[in-house]
């Protein structure tokens, strides 16, 4: 839904994006926008371009950033872009090839998101354990009950298994192996 139209020595961008990570806390934004109308391309993924936008130089009237407050520890936003003019030098790579560039970074992003999810899980398990140990009912902490212990233990076991997969995927990435399977499994298990 975001289109960048050639204008002068640059592009005029209009549209909206949802599920954009950390835009409200960022100085720079990688923006994928359609530069060739969809009816003029063979595949839907053709005709997309990537732009590097310096948010510090953009007026709020051209980009509105609205937080989506649905997830703890994940600063997700929705962007509304209106008549944003950017120079040609903000284009990354070749016009129309942007989807390929974005795809090349997907595996790294999936491993990163999986690692964030592991951190979230550790925090929630710790919170649940502390609450169960400190909540006294009938003169004993509720953590003494199997009905409390088992779900926390099961969550911990799932988190540890996912953590191993995240480490495996990260090691492959660090070794220069672009392993989509490991990255996807890590994100699936950790999410």
Predicted features by range, described:
Residues 1-3, 10, 28-32, 50-52, ...:
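Conserved hydrophobic/aromatic beta-strand scaffold that supports enzyme active sites
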Residues 5, 36-38, 70-71:
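Short polar/acidic secondary-structure junctions
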Residues 6-12, 78-83, 97, 104-191:
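Alpha-helical interface subdomain recognition
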Residues 7, 16, 20-23, 68, ...:
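Residue-level recognition of beta-strand microenvironments
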Residues 18-24, 71, 108-112:
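Glycine-rich phosphate/pyrophosphate-binding beta-alpha loops
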Residues 57-85:
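Flexible, small-/acidic-enriched active-site or ligand-binding loops
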Residues 90-95:
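Cytochrome P450 core scaffold surrounding the K-helix E-X-X-R motif
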Residues 14-62:
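A short core secondary-structure module
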């Amino acid at each position: 839904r975001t289109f960048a139209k050639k204008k002068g020595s640059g592009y005029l961008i209009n549209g909206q994006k949802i599920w954009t990570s950390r835009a409200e806390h960022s100085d720079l934004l990688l923006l994928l926008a359609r530069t060739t109308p969809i009816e003029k391309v063979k595949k839907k993924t053709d005709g997309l371009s990537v732009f590097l936008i310096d948010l510090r130089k953009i007026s709020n009237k051209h980009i509105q950033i609205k937080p989506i407050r649905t997830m703890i520890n994940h600063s997700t936003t929705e962007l509304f872009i209106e008549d944003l003019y950017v120079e040609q030098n903000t284009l990354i790579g070749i016009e129309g090839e942007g989807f390929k560039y974005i795809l090349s970074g997907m595996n790294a992003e999936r491993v990163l998101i999986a690692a964030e999810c592991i951190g979230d899980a550790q925090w929630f398990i710790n919170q649940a354990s502390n609450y169960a140990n400190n909540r006294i009912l009938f003169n004993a902490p509720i953590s003494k009950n199997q009905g409390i212990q088992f779900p926390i233990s099961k969550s911990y076991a799932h988190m540890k298994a996912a953590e191993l997969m995240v480490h495996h995927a990260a090691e492959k990435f660090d070794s220069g192996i672009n392993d989509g399977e490991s990255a996807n499994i890590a994100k699936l298990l950790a999410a």
